[in-house]
A protein has these predicted regions:
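Bacterial N-terminal signal peptides that target proteins for export
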Residues: 1-10
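C-terminal motif of bacterial Sec signal peptides marking the signal peptidase cleavage site
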Residues: 19-22
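Short coil-to-beta-strand transition motifs
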Residues: 142-149
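Sec-dependent N-terminal signal peptides
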Residues: 11-16
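Structural motif
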Residues: 137-138
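Solvent-exposed, non-transmembrane regions of membrane-associated and secreted proteins
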Residues: 24-134, 143, 154-202
Length: 202
C-alpha cells in the first residue's frame, strides 16, 4: 500500500475496524475472491437530487468500467456492539450489516457510514470480495430513499480489535463510507480486518 494511503487509513478510520468473531469454519473450502461479473440488482441510476438518510438495503461493488462483481442484500437488522466487553461487532449471518452507531446513508449525512460483514476461511460470504476492491472502484448503496454512489479511495488490512470507544480518530466525515470484514489470506484467517474507504460522489 502506498505510504500516503497507509497514513490516511491509520489516522482517519482505525477506530472503525471491527473485532468480528466467527470467521473460521469447518466446512469445505471456497474459491478465492475475484472480480468475475455478476448480475446487478440495482438498476436505477443515482438521482441528481438529495437522498434522505435511510438504512441501506442493498450493496454492490463495481469496477471502474461499471462491471458489477458483488451484489448482495444488507441484513435488515442493524448491527450493534456485543460480547462481554461490548466492543465486538458480530453480524448474525453471512450478510453484511449496517452499524447502527454510524451514520445513516444519505446525501446530507454528516457522520461516517459503516457496513461490516463476515469473511470466512471455509465457507462463502459476500464480503470476501473486499479483498479484490481497488481504488477507483464504485460502491453502490440502495436505500428506501434512493441510490448512493461512493468512489473507493483506500483499501488495506488493519489489526483486529482497533478502537470502538471514544477517540480522536473516530471523527465524523460527511460522505465517507467504510466497509470492513475479517481478513482471510490463502484460505486462512488472519489477525486483521480488511477495510475499504470510499467517499460519496452522488
Amino acid at each position: 500500500m502506498p505510504p500516503r494511503s497507509t497514513r490516511w487509513l491509520c489516522t482517519a478510520i482505525l477506530t472503525f475496524v471491527l473485532l468480528v468473531s466467527g470467521c473460521a469454519s469447518d466446512e469445505v473450502g471456497i474459491a478465492a475472491p475475484d472480480r468475475s461479473p455478476v448480475q446487478s440488482q440495482i438498476s436505477v441510476a443515482a438521482p441528481a437530487g438529495d437522498v434522505a438518510p435511510a438504512q441501506p438495503e442493498y450493496i454492490e461493488l463495481r469496477s471502474s468500467d461499471g462491471t458489477t462483481y458483488l451484489s448482495s442484500p444488507i441484513h435488515p437488522d442493524p448491527l450493534y456492539r456485543g460480547g462481554e466487553s461490548g466492543q465486538v461487532l458480530n453480524p448474525v449471518d453471512e450478510l453484511p450489516a449496517w452499524w447502527a452507531e454510524s451514520g445513516m446513508p444519505g446525501t446530507s449525512t454528516e457522520q461516517t457510514v459503516v457496513v461490516a460483514g463476515h469473511n470466512y476461511s471455509k465457507r462463502d460470504a459476500p464480503f470476501k470480495a473486499l479483498r479484490v476492491v481497488t481504488p477507483g472502484d464504485t460502491v453502490v448503496l440502495r436505500t428506501a430513499s434512493g441510490t448512493l454512489e461512493y468512489a473507493v479511495e483506500s483499501v488495506g488490512p488493519l489489526p483486529k480489535g482497533s478502537l470502538l470507544a471514544d477517540n480522536e480518530l473516530r471523527r465524523s466525515v460527511p460522505g465517507r463510507l467504510i466497509l470492513a470484514n475479517c481478513d482471510v489470506q490463502g484460505g486462512e484467517p488472519t489477525d486483521d480486518n480488511f477495510v475499504v474507504v470510499a467517499q460519496l460522489v452522488r
